UniProtKB/Swiss-Prot annotation:
<dbReference type="GO" id="GO:0070180">
    <property type="term" value="F:large ribosomal subunit rRNA binding"/>
</dbReference>
<dbReference type="InterPro" id="IPR043141">
    <property type="entry name" value="Ribosomal_uL10-like_sf"/>
</dbReference>
<dbReference type="InterPro" id="IPR047865">
    <property type="entry name" value="Ribosomal_uL10_bac_type"/>
</dbReference>
<comment type="similarity">
    <text>Belongs to the universal ribosomal protein uL10 family.</text>
</comment>
<dbReference type="GO" id="GO:0006412">
    <property type="term" value="P:translation"/>
</dbReference>
<keyword id="KW-0699">rRNA-binding</keyword>
<dbReference type="InterPro" id="IPR002363">
    <property type="entry name" value="Ribosomal_uL10_CS_bac"/>
</dbReference>
<keyword id="KW-0689">Ribosomal protein</keyword>
<dbReference type="GO" id="GO:0015934">
    <property type="term" value="C:large ribosomal subunit"/>
</dbReference>
<keyword id="KW-0694">RNA-binding</keyword>
<dbReference type="GO" id="GO:0003735">
    <property type="term" value="F:structural constituent of ribosome"/>
</dbReference>
<keyword id="KW-0687">Ribonucleoprotein</keyword>
<dbReference type="Pfam" id="PF00466">
    <property type="entry name" value="Ribosomal_L10"/>
</dbReference>
<comment type="function">
    <text>Forms part of the ribosomal stalk, playing a central role in the interaction of the ribosome with GTP-bound translation factors.</text>
</comment>
<dbReference type="InterPro" id="IPR022973">
    <property type="entry name" value="Ribosomal_uL10_bac"/>
</dbReference>
<dbReference type="InterPro" id="IPR001790">
    <property type="entry name" value="Ribosomal_uL10"/>
</dbReference>
<protein>
    <recommendedName>
        <fullName>Large ribosomal subunit protein uL10</fullName>
    </recommendedName>
</protein>
């Protein structure tokens, strides 16, 4: 890899570290190609991406960023899983780690916050953005449904009483 290629990789990694909602750093020594493809597929399905980069280039890219604290994690065979959604990549990486002993989460970053392995696992347990939006929408819609039910209830009760009177008269 020549100098121009290295500079391009550093620039790409810098954009990843600056713009991603979450970055998960893990060791992947011992994973097969099939395992790596599975990891990439899971993270991609969650809306993220996976990247293997030279540690030295990743450390250069991290220098001067808000998440420079994760540069200490860049030792050995490291892989980055990242996504714009602050939960997606962490959730996919955590699920993959539970099934593969050779994939060891070291830590990561969420926004400007540096996370250890337990922090990444805690983020993975959080509901995704879509789940939060749907639960908020459900909470907002529930009072309207209750009001509509309350408005319609007296008419339904009157109809029920009239029906009962009619049955007794017959």
């Amino acid at each position: 890899m020549d100098r121009a290629q290295k500079e391009k990789v550093v620039e790409e990694l810098g954009q990843i570290f600056e713009s991603s909602g979450v970055v998960v750093v893990a060791h992947y020594q011992g994973l097969t190609v099939a395992n790596m493809q599975d990891l990439r597929g899971r993270v991609r399905d969650a809306g993220g991406a996976v990247r293997v980069a030279k540690n030295k280039l990743a450390k250069i890219a991290l220098d001067g960023t808000d998440v420079a604290g994760i540069s200490d994690l860049m030792t050995g065979m490291t892989v980055l899983a990242y996504s714009d959604d602050p939960v997606a990549a962490a959730k996919a990486a955590d699920e993959f780690a539970k099934e593969n002993d050779n994939y060891v989460i070291l830590g990561g970053a969420m926004g400007e916050n540096i996370l250890d392995a337990d922090g990444v696992k805690a983020v993975a347990k959080m509901p995704s953005r879509e789940e939060l939006i749907s639960s908020i929408a459900g909470c907002i819609g529930a009072p309207a449904a209750n009001i509509a039910g309350a408005i319609g209830a007296p008419a339904s009760n009157i109809a029920s009483v009239l029906s009962t009177i009619e049955e007794k008269a017959a």
